[in-house]
Amino acid sequence: MRKITATLKGDGPILRAVMHYLVTNAGMEVVGESSDSLDLLCSIDRLRPEVVFLWASDGLKEPGIVSHLLQEFPHLKVVVVSPNHFTISDVGARSRQSLDLSMESIRASVVESLAQ
């Protein structure tokens, strides 16, 4: 079975390591990690992942980052991970869905989104 490819964006290496663990244990392949938006854009352009996992506190420094990503890369699915529901719209998300962070729910949500 082909693995879904993902790129991660988070401020620090510890946060990215946790995200990497969750994403890979959900059965996806992490093809890139970024700590800043320029690196993220270059990484997406070069690697063409299917999904980006974006830590929302990063987006607060860059309002509208999700809208920009979706405009530049229409094929891309963006999963915004946030400890605070109110930050989701600040980064330009079109919809919001609360999920538990189990491996099964992450994978099921991404697979469902890719099927649309």
Predicted regions located by residue number:
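Internal alpha/beta domain cores that form substrate/cofactor-binding pockets in large enzymes
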Residues: 2-47, 51-116
